[in-house]
């Protein structure tokens, strides 16, 4: 029985991968005077922390100041591109109805995201997340977490639910693996990367969905 739900955010509740790619493209043009290739994107950018991406683009010559500056600039571009594309600037279909269903069932839920605080604040304000969950319970990249496993464990503590009794909703292979390693055995995958067959074979995965209407 599910006693708590932990959502990843980017690619799970909000489809935004193209905005991240566009933002890194803008930074790449500043740093290297060229765009990112598809090969680079898959090898050096997808699922990689900002710091490592910036080091890659600076040929491992980036200072701490460089990393801080360009990381913040990338996220600023990202938020700008999100706001400019109003047609896609919304949560995945069925999200709010699923939140309401969980509320009605008195099942607590929160978010565990690798996003930085500025982006979390942006999401809370833009999507009115404070109406649905305690903002203080949202887990984000505050610089203290070693990995997403630690984030999931902390999110379960915030909900006051054993992680074995939590449902985790993810969208990436690494996120699914981290959820399983954290102790979760009930993982739902949002198929934003169109990789259903592979996800269905992964340990802990109980369902693969395209949007949250499938859970209502």
Each model region followed by its residue ranges:
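Asp-based, Mg2+/Mn2+-dependent phosphohydrolase catalytic module
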Residues: 1-3, 117, 122-216
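N-terminal helical cap/lid subdomain that shapes the substrate entry/recognition surface
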Residues: 2-93
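Conserved phosphate-coupling serine/threonine residues in phosphotransfer and NTP-handling enzymes
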Residues: 12, 113-115
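Conserved SAM-binding loop
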Residues: 13, 109, 168-169
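Short beta->alpha linker loops
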Residues: 19, 45-48, 90-94, 115, ...
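Short phosphate-binding/catalytic loops that engage adenosine nucleotides
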Residues: 62, 107, 184-185
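Short, acidic loop-to-helix structural element flanking the phosphoryl-transfer center
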Residues: 80-111, 149
């Amino acid at each position: 029985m599910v006693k708590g739900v932990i959502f990843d955010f980017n690619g799970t509740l909000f489809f935004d991968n193209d905005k991240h790619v566009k933002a890194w493209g803008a930074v790449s043009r500043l740093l290297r005077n060229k765009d990112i290739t598809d090969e680079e994107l898959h090898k050096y950018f997808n699922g990689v922390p900002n710091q490592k991406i910036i080091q890659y683009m600076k040929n491992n010559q980036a200072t701490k100041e460089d990393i801080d500056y360009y990381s913040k600039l990338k996220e600023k571009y990202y938020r700008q591109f999100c706001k400019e594309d109003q047609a896609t600037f919304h949560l995945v279909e069925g999200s709010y109805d699923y939140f309401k269903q969980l509320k009605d069932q008195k099942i607590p839920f929160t978010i565990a995201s690798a996003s930085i605080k500025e982006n979390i604040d942006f999401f809370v304000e833009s999507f009115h997340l404070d109406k649905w969950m305690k903002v203080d319970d949202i887990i984000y990249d505050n610089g203290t977490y070693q990995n997403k496993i630690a984030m999931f464990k902390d999110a379960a503590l915030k909900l006051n639910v054993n992680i074995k009794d939590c449902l985790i909703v993810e969208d990436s292979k690494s996120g699914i693996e981290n959820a399983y390693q954290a102790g979760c055995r009930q993982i739902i995958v949002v198929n934003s990367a169109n990789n259903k067959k592979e996800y269905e074979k992964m340990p802990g995965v109980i369902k693969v969905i395209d949007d949250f209407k499938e859970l209502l």
